[in-house]
Amino acid sequence: MLTIALSKGRILEQTLPLLEKSGLIIAKEELNSRKLILDTNLTDVQVIIIRATDVPVFVQHGAADIGIAGKDVLLEHGANNLFEVLDLDITKCKLMVAAESKDKLKQNTLKIATKYVNSTKRYFQNKGQSCEIIKLYGAMELAPKVGLAHCIVDLVDTGNTLKANGLIAVERIEEISSRLVVNTASFKTKNAQIKSWIQNIEYNL
């Protein structure tokens, strides 16, 4: 049995057509149910629906053979025991530093609000910038307005939310899109099946 880990939301919506082109169909009744393990039209493939941040964890520990996750999640989680094999070129956006102005980044110790703690730390360490990272789970754009932080690090798509809150994107950390990842052990034990899936998906990109 091959287990594929997906997360609900944009990734699932944009991945389903690609999977269908590759021969994997999940019935609407399955998708609309409260089940977390979904049957497919293929007897040897099942899909599990989990939180986006948990996809690499399930793949890393072998609870799923294949997963589809955003590059932002993979950067935060690390890549032990998994291969990143394909850029699916969907759910595209950018991980950006945003502030009220570029001058706000000129600080001895920069205060940054973000939920992307590891990516932020790596980026500013590589620049040699001393920083204090404040972990938030939402309403990131509020932090500079109320003096909580000098800037934020967040995903930016159109930039409209930043603009509406008086912020501008000042530095790009990473281009983000959904990636296909594979458990390293599964790649050896289920090599033919997994390679076939990778080739099918790559062909239909």
UniProtKB/Swiss-Prot annotation:
A GO CC annotation recorded here is: cytoplasm
* Localization in the cell: Cytoplasm
User: Which molecular-function annotation in GO is an example for this chain?
Assistant: ATP binding
EC code(s) of this entry: 2.4.2.17
Class in the EC hierarchy, top level: transferase
For this UniProt record, give its keywords in alphabetical order, as a comma-separated list. Amino-acid biosynthesis, ATP-binding, Cytoplasm, Glycosyltransferase, Histidine biosynthesis, Nucleotide-binding, Transferase
So what does this thing catalyse? 1-(5-phospho-beta-D-ribosyl)-ATP + diphosphate = 5-phospho-alpha-D-ribose 1-diphosphate + ATP
Q: List the disulfide bonds.
A: none
Q: Tell me which stretches of the chain form a coiled coil.
A: none
InterPro entries named among the record's database cross-references: ATP_PRibTrfase_cat, ATP_PRibTrfase_CS, ATP_PRibTrfase_HisG, ATP_PRibTrfase_HisG_short
Identify the pathway.
Amino-acid biosynthesis; L-histidine biosynthesis; L-histidine from 5-phospho-alpha-D-ribose 1-diphosphate: step 1/9
Q: Pfam families in the record, alphabetically?
A: HisG (PF01634)
Gene Ontology biological process terms, A to Z: L-histidine biosynthetic process
UniProt note: domains:
Lacks the C-terminal regulatory region which is replaced by HisZ.
Subunit and interaction comment: Heteromultimer composed of HisG and HisZ subunits.
Q: What does this protein do?
A: Catalyzes the condensation of ATP and 5-phosphoribose 1-diphosphate to form N'-(5'-phosphoribosyl)-ATP (PR-ATP). Has a crucial role in the pathway because the rate of histidine biosynthesis seems to be controlled primarily by regulation of HisG enzymatic activity.
Similarity annotation: Belongs to the ATP phosphoribosyltransferase family. Short subfamily.
Protein name, per record:
ATP phosphoribosyltransferase
Species of the source: Ruthia magnifica subsp. Calyptogena magnifica
